[in-house]
Amino acid sequence: MNDLSRVSVVLPSLDPDDKLVAVVDGLLEYGFSDIILINDGSKPENLHYFHDLAAQHPEITLLHHEVNKGKGAALKNAFRYVLQNRPDSLGVVTVDGDNQHHPEDTRACCEKMLETGCVVLGCRDFSQPDVPPRSRFGNRTTSAIFKVFVGMTISDTQTGLRAIPASYLNQLAEVYGDRFEYETNMLLAFKDQGIPFDEQKIRTVYIEENKSSHFRVIHDSWRIYKLILAHFFRYTLSSLASAAVDIGGYSLL
């Protein structure tokens, strides 16, 4: 088994409840010993979860945002922290705090990352009958748009479980976006920057139909689709301009 002591868990959280405690307990049980927990501007009544966990577990490093900056900002903050404070790091794994990522799956993604040197996406099976309709529709739609407009085959575009080798952290810390759109921009960066990625099948878990998610279906989905379409048109126009220059140059010969 690969050594997980040099892989940092990146765990952003906003207004947590007891599920965050279960996530941390599971990660520790499965051998993770470096957890970077980010309080992304939580309400005062939720802050005790962060303080209690950090006091109980020396494996936890606690980062604070005084105001909510967004999931993307929290992830990038943690990536920069690892780059500055974990010189021997082999990578990170991003995990959501709603207890929908089983720690065994988290470990499997990390082990595959260490074996292949690729970014590993933990991908759910949306054909399962207990998947909420909005989640099934949203993920299938986004996967289809990625396939058609970007040329990337990704079975779970909205997964928050991502194991990332340390060699790519600097690049991904500079990717644009501070909120949920950052995770989409990260996937587009794989395409633009030639970052290799692979998938790992994981459990499909939805607790109370994902009611604890801070993802706003219409608002955040539209922001994601705009990013993908903008990426498509940017590259299409670039290709057309390049072709026009080639044709113009040829006509002068």
Question: What are the residue ranges of the model-derived segments?
Answer:
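A conserved acidic beta->alpha catalytic loop
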Residues: 39-50, 67, 99-100
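Cell-envelope/extracellular polymer assembly enzymes that use nucleotide-activated donors
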Residues: 6-8, 34, 185
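Short, well-formed alpha-helical segments that are part of the catalytic scaffolds
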Residues: 15-29
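Acceptor/aglycone-binding surface of glycosyltransferases and processive sugar-polymer synthases
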Residues: 66-67, 73-84, 103-180, 207-215, ...
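Hydrophobic helical membrane-anchoring modules
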Residues: 1-3, 175-248
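Conserved short acidic donor-positioning loop in nucleotide-sugar-dependent glycosyltransferases
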Residues: 15, 40-42, 69, 78
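Short beta-strand-to-loop acidic/aromatic patch adjacent to the donor-nucleotide binding site
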Residues: 86-100
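Acidic helix N-cap motif at the loop->helix transition within catalytic regions
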Residues: 19-22, 44-53, 104
